[in-house]
Regions:
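Charged, low-complexity intrinsically disordered terminal segments
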Residues: 1-278
Length: 278
C-alpha cells in the first residue's frame, strides 16, 4: 500500500467491521496517526464491536499512559506486551514484540513493517530522511494466520484465551466478503503462508522457511529487508540458489536508520553478488 494512503485506507476498513477488530503494533505514538487510529477504533467500540489492542511496552516507552487509558475509556480493550518496570530490571526487556498486525472480522488483514507513527507516513523532521516501509492488505484464509498470531500474543499480554470459531470465518463467508471488495488487488488467487517465530521456540521457523524456499526455488526469489545480516546458512542458501540459475534479487536501503547496521549489511553484499545475486 502507498504509505500516504495507508492510514485512511486502514481507517476506512474499520467501519465495515461487524464483530471484532484486533490491532497489534510495536510502536503506537500519541500523534496525528495514533489519534486517527484511536478515534476509528473508538467509533466501532461504541457500536458494540469487540476491539482489542496490543502494544509493546518498550516500543511505547515514550507514550504517556493516558493515551491508552483514553482508549480503555472508549471501550477498547488494551494490553501491554510484557511490561518492564524499573528499578526492577528483568530479562523481559529484551523479549519484545515487533509484530504489526491488524485483523478485521477474521477476513481482512494488514501486516508489514509500518508502525503507527507520523514518521512512517510523511517527513516530520526536515533533517531526517523520509521513512520508507511496506505494509500489505490481505483477505481470505491467510488472515487466519495473523489471527492466531494476535490471539497468542493477547493470551500473553492479557491472560485471556480466545478460541471461538467466530474468529476464524468459514471459507464460504470469506469468499462472499471478498466478492464485494472494491479495493485494488494484486491477485485473487495468491498463495500466502503466515509464519511466526519466538525466541523460545525449539526451531527458527522463519529462517528455516526462507532457506527451504530458496533451495526449492526454480525460477525466481525476490527478497526485501531493511537490514541484511544473514546467518551462514542463509548466506549459503542465497548463493546456492543464484549459482543454480535462479533469479535471486535483493533489495536493501542505501541508508538505514542506524549507521552501523548500514555498514554491517554492506559487508555481506560482495559474497552474494559474486554468486550472481542481483
Amino acid at each position: 500500500l502507498p504509505k500516504t494512503a495507508w492510514p485512511p485506507t486502514w481507517a476506512a476498513a474499520c467501519p465495515s467491521a461487524r464483530h471484532h477488530i484486533h490491532v497489534e503494533f510495536y510502536i503506537i505514538e500519541d500523534d496525528k496517526v495514533g489519534r486517527l487510529v484511536r478515534e476509528a477504533l473508538a467509533v466501532k467500540a461504541r457500536e458494540g464491536v469487540s476491539v482489542r489492542l496490543v502494544y509493546d511496552d518498550v516500543g511505547c516507552w515514550n507514550v504517556k499512559n493516558r493515551f491508552f487509558k483514553q482508549m480503555e475509556a472508549e471501550g477498547i480493550q488494551v494490553a501491554a506486551f510484557l511490561p518492564v518496570r524499573f528499578p526492577k530490571f528483568t530479562s523481559k526487556v529484551d523479549f519484545r514484540n515487533h509484530r504489526k498486525i491488524v485483523v478485521i472480522d477474521g477476513i481482512i488483514g494488514y501486516v508489514g513493517g509500518m508502525n503507527l507513527a507520523e514518521r512512517y507516513f510523511y517527513q516530520v523532521d526536515k533533517n531526517q530522511p523520509v521513512w520508507r516501509d511496506t505494509h500489505v492488505r490481505i483477505m481470505g484464509n491467510a488472515v487466519g494466520g495473523l489471527q492466531r498470531a494476535f490471539l497468542s500474543d493477547w493470551y500473553v499480554a492479557a491472560g485471556q484465551t480466545i478460541t471461538d470459531q467466530v474468529y476464524y470465518p468459514r471459507e464460504e463467508e470469506c469468499r462472499k466478503i471478498m466478492a464485494c471488495d472494491r479495493e485494488p488487488y494484486v491477485s485473487r488467487n495468491a498463495l500466502i503462508q503466515i509464519v511466526t517465530s519466538i525466541p523460545t521456540a525449539p526451531w527458527p521457523d522463519i529462517m528455516q522457511g526462507m532457506i527451504l524456499a530458496l533451495l526449492r526455488a526454480r525460477q525466481y526469489c525476490y527478497l526485501q529487508s531493511p537490514y541484511f545480516m544473514p546467518t551462514e546458512r542463509m548466506l549459503f542458501a542465497l548463493q546456492t540458489a543464484a549459482l543454480a540459475g535462479v533469479d535471486v534479487r535483493l533489495m536493501i536501503p542505501e541508508r538505514t536508520d542506524k549507521r552501523f547496521l548500514t555498514w554491517a549489511s554492506r559487508s555481506f553484499l560482495h559474497d552474494v553478488i559474486r554468486a550472481g545475486v542481483r
